[in-house]
């Protein structure tokens, strides 16, 4: 109930500054009795997906808690899963500021963060301290200065390091803010990456005596033909799940709005329909052979239900959480 007042204050600030201040406060309470301040009781609605039991179908999408600093505080709000990252082998600063913009009228965000994070080792130290009782996903990417041709090495380094601590691993090949990254979604480059990831997963399963599922996160800007090829590759390589979708480069729904011409990926309500269409097409192609985690513009119970009706087993929120606050979690979980 109090979030509209908090939002009003935060929205007076630069978006990245608002994020930093919010996380400063969440860091203070995470892992302490003060977590009670943000705790919400939500209904238990268990879902089986990728061989894991999720206590409810709603997750936090990657990008909000890049370094795994506030896992417990965010978990207290009622998420069934939290995806931290994107994390890279080495720390990196990301792109120059400003790099995050609100499109308030559209309830959307444009970001060109560029995988700013403190590196995989730092993330793991934070994950070790967390007591979240839901499923923890760790989203991995490549460093900006790693040539795309050697990009798979970065994913394998991250996989090796996070495997013991992850409920599932998300492979991000769809951010528009790392030059060349999206080329990994196509043809031989995708097959080469997925083959290496599957081999590494099998190797790590032997070492750790546990199977950690791998999901691949795709872009909403794929054509139908490209989507069919991606689906075929995911099935052929026995990938465990697909996260659909990342942010879009399409600005058709926000033309003329403040910040609409900023470079970067657009998320929030403007990507809602596009991501749902991708999920529907993907579901028709996959025919249940691997599960879909639906993300993109979910800002209400109806939007979440639309993703699930289109074929998603689980859903995630990010921008909707920024615009609507923790109450959205409770509404979606209790009524989905």
Curated annotation (Swiss-Prot):
Q: What is its main location?
A: membrane
Per the record, the pathway is: Pyrimidine metabolism; UMP biosynthesis via de novo pathway; orotate from (S)-dihydroorotate (quinone route): step 1/1
Which GO-annotated molecular functions does the record name? dihydroorotate dehydrogenase (quinone) activity
Q: Where in the cell is it found?
A: Cell membrane
Q: What is its EC number?
A: 1.3.5.2
What SUPFAM superfamilies does this protein's entry cite? Answer: FMN-linked oxidoreductases
UniProt xrefs under NCBIfam families: PRK05286.1-1, PRK05286.1-2, PRK05286.1-4, PRK05286.2-5, pyrD_sub2
Q: What is this protein called?
A: Dihydroorotate dehydrogenase (quinone)
Q: What organism is the protein native to?
A: Enterobacter sp. (strain 638)
